[in-house]
Structure formats: structure tokens, C-alpha cells
UniProtKB/Swiss-Prot annotation:
The keyword Transport applies. This is Golgi to ER traffic protein 2. Signal peptide: none annotated. It is a multi-pass membrane protein. The gene is GET2. It is found in: Endoplasmic reticulum membrane; Golgi apparatus membrane. Residues 41-52 have a biased composition (Polar residues). InterPro entries: GET2, Get2/sif1. The keyword Transmembrane applies. GO terms for cellular component: endoplasmic reticulum membrane; GET complex; Golgi membrane. Residues 195-220, 306-307 are lumenal. Pfam families: GET2. The chain crosses the membrane at residues 174-194, 221-240, 285-305. Belongs to the GET2 family.
Length: 307
């Protein structure tokens, strides 16, 4: 029996390249990549190049935890996190006092002179006084300027605002009180004659025919009415003048504001302002009488429908 020997397998060119590539990778994996790279670069060069380090031999960075083990942090109060922020008021609905303060600061430098005093003839001062009168507060007297309006002291400004609010409250309070008194007195006078004097409501035209008779129920009624009106008007003027509210109520008139604006162009109007203010005061007093007469007319009109 003859020995049979196997001939070595013939490797193809592709397999040779693959084996060569695997051997090269194995050498580089052993840390020889840098030497091989320098050997290749130095071939064909008469000058020795500097050492080059292969990226395969560079140490790969390892991920390290940056967390520092320390004590547990302080626990924050949940009320500080969960509490909602204060609501922001809508545009245009801010506090009126804050708006007045801003407007006051804007004109403060223009109102005050070089010596820090207020010039009564300054048109800006007059405009500010008109705005102050329009808010329903006790405005300054004729020809006077309230320098405390433009004070830099916030305490003084707060005091002036509180004083204005108090004067406005006093005006409304006393006017409402006198209104109740006027209505009660007029109704009492009317129903007293209606219930106690038979001829007061005997006919639709009894208040005309009774003028020629012995009893004059309508004349007596108007006599008591006139007496009550005089007493009420005098008390109204006394209370408002004593509290300093009578003049303040007159200064809120649109006529006085127009005259104050016109006096910037025609200074002669300042001469007539006291007269107009006095006329407006009398007009308010007569308005009380006219209002009570209107109530009497309504009562007599209702009386004419009862018979």
C-alpha cells in the first residue's frame, strides 16, 4: 500500500490578504502600532522624523462618576414651592393711589422752583389743583396753593390722601343725612294735614277754593313747609361751613374748572372766580328748596288721583 500525502492547499490572493491583515492587526493589538508607524514614515526619508504616536496606543478614557457622595441635602419646605405667586392686576386696574404718586413725581421737578418752593402762578400747579378738586377732595381756597401736594415726604403725601378721602366721606355722609331729614319732614307735614284737616283732600281743587274760606289748610301747609326749609337750609350751611366742606363742594363744579383753565389764557378770570363760587354756593342752597318743592308737587299730583 502506497503512502498518500496531501498537498498543501493553494491559498487564493484574497485569503492571503486576509491573513496578512489579521497578522497586522494582531501585532498592532500588542502595542506595536507606534513602532510600525514610525518605521513606515522613516522609509524613503533621509531625515529621521520625530516620533509619532499611533492612536491605537493612546489610552482610552474611562468613564468616571462625577457624583460626590455627601450628606443628604436639606429638604426644602413644600410651601415655598407650591405657593402660587401673587396675582398681577390687569393693565389699567392698578391702585389709584399709585397712579397719583407716579403722576405726582413726574411733575414734581417742574412744579418746584430753584429754591424748592411752589410758584402759585405756575400753570402746572393750577392744573394739578384742578385734578385734585376733581377727585372730590377739599380743594384749596381761591388764590391759595397747597404746597404739601408736591412734598417729597411720603408720609406727608399719605396724610394728604387720607385727608382727601375723609373729606369726601364727610360730604357724602352729611348730604345723605340732610336728604333723609328733608324727606321725612316734608312727608310728615303733608300727611299731617291730609289726615287731620278734612278740607285738605275734599276735592281735586280744594287747595284753590280753601284760600277764600275760614280755614286755609294749604296755606298752613306751605307756612310750615317754608319754616322747615329755612331751618334745614341754615343748618346745612352751618354744618358744611364749620367742617370746611361747603367750599370744597363748590370747587368741584365744572364751571370753576373751566374758569381755572381759562385763567391761564385770560388772567382777568381770576377776579370773577370768587363771585362765581359764591353764586354756586347759593345755587346749591336753592337746589335744596327746589328739590323739596318737587316732592310736594308729586304728592299733590298723587292726591289729585285719589278723588
Amino acid at each position: 500500500m502506497s503512502d498518500s500525502t496531501d498537498s498543501p492547499a493553494v491559498l487564493s490572493a484574497e485569503e492571503k490578504r486576509r491573513l496578512l491583515r489579521e497578522r497586522r492587526q494582531a501585532k498592532m493589538a500588542k502595542g506595536q502600532a507606534t513602532d510600525r508607524l514610525n518605521n513606515i514614515l522613516s522609509q524613503g526619508s533621509s531625515v529621521k522624523t520625530t516620533g509619532v504616536k499611533s492612536v491605537l496606543d493612546e489610552p482610552q478614557p474611562t468613564a468616571t462618576s462625577s457624583a460626590i457622595h455627601d450628606e443628604d441635602p436639606d429638604i426644602q419646605d413644600i410651601s415655598e414651592i407650591a405657593s402660587p405667586p401673587p396675582p398681577t392686576p390687569p393693565i389699567g386696574e392698578g391702585s389709584p393711589e399709585n397712579i397719583d404718586d407716579i403722576f405726582q413725581k413726574m411733575l414734581q421737578q417742574q412744579v418746584q422752583g430753584k429754591d424748592g418752593k411752589v410758584d402759585p402762578n405756575d400753570p402746572i400747579v393750577q392744573i394739578m389743583n384742578m385734578f385734585k378738586d376733581g377727585s372730590g377732595a377739599d380743594g384749596p381756597q381761591e388764590g391759595d396753593v397747597n404746597a404739601n401736594e408736591f412734598s417729597n415726604d411720603p408720609v406727608e403725601n399719605k396724610y394728604q390722601q387720607d385727608l382727601q378721602a375723609y373729606d369726601t366721606y364727610q360730604q357724602k355722609l352729611w348730604k345723605s343725612r340732610f336728604l333723609v331729614i328733608r324727606v321725612v319732614v316734608t312727608l310728615f307735614n303733608f300727611f299731617y294735614h291730609y289726615l287731620n284737616v278734612p278740607s285738605f283732600h275734599a276735592s281735586n281743587y280744594s287747595y284753590v277754593r280753601d284760600l277764600a274760606q275760614d280755614e286755609f289748610p294749604v296755606r298752613n301747609f306751605f307756612t310750615w313747609f317754608a319754616a322747615f326749609e329755612v331751618i334745614i337750609v341754615l343748618q346745612y350751611y352751618t354744618v358744611f361751613h364749620k367742617l370746611g366742606l361747603f367750599h370744597a363742594a363748590n370747587q368741584n363744579s365744572m364751571i370753576m374748572k373751566l374758569m381755572s383753565m381759562g385763567s391761564m389764557v385770560l388772567p382777568q378770570l381770576n377776579t370773577y372766580q370768587p363771585l362765581v363760587a359764591r353764586f354756586l354756593g347759593y345755587y346749591e342752597l336753592f337746589g335744596i328748596i327746589f328739590g323739596d318743592l318737587s316732592l310736594v308737587i308729586v304728592l299733590f299730583g298723587l292726591l289729585s288721583f285719589t278723588k
